[in-house]
Amino acid sequence: MVKIVTEQYSVINAKIYRACNKIDKATISISADIIDNSQFEIPDNKIFNPGTELKFQAGPTDKVSTLFEGCVTTHQLKINSEQQTLFVLECRGFAYPATFGRKNNVYENSKDDAVIKKILGQYGLSAKVDSTGIEIPQLVQYYCTDWDFVLTRAQNNGLVVITDGKQ
């Protein structure tokens, strides 16, 4: 887990995007200083590499609350309107890998809530799902991502998906 302390890095801004039926997204912009050879001074360690887990926390030191948990997906250099060089990290929630690749699968004699828990469990996520009641003899996932299939099954049962870290 990465800890970016404002005394260590000059954090320009941090944005967190959360919505129902969407995977959380966050961006953090850190000041990147220009050195003599017109190269950018990017932190030399690997804490900003894609795949690194990151946690956004805020509040007084005795009452810190977590606003976002996820992993770095991309990093880039940008120049803003004030000609300030920024090192921008884009992060996604832990459910993000469920959007990779379309899959085919058949679930037999299963309830939708059990299927949702099983799929999300493959990505190290825990799910709190209301009971869906009806056992379906054969449920087919055809050429869609696991995330899209989870959303479809939740919507068919009048449920919404809200991600929060590894839940």
Annotate each predicted stretch with a short phrase.
Residues 1-53, 87-98, 130, 159, ...:
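Juxtamembrane "anchor/assembly" segments of surface/extracellular structural proteins
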Residues 1-3, 38-78, 113-122:
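Short, acidic/charged, Gly/Pro-enriched secondary-structure junctions
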Residues 25, 99, 116-141, 167:
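N-terminal export/assembly leaders
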Residues 42-43, 100-111, 132-146:
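Aromatic/His-enriched, Gly/Pro-containing loop or helix-boundary segments
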Residues 59, 63, 107-122, 142-156:
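Polar, S/T/G-rich
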Residues 69-76, 81-95, 102, 110:
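Signal peptide-directed extracytoplasmic domains
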Residues 79, 86-95, 131-167:
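Short beta-strand-centered interaction patches in the first periplasmic/extracellular domains
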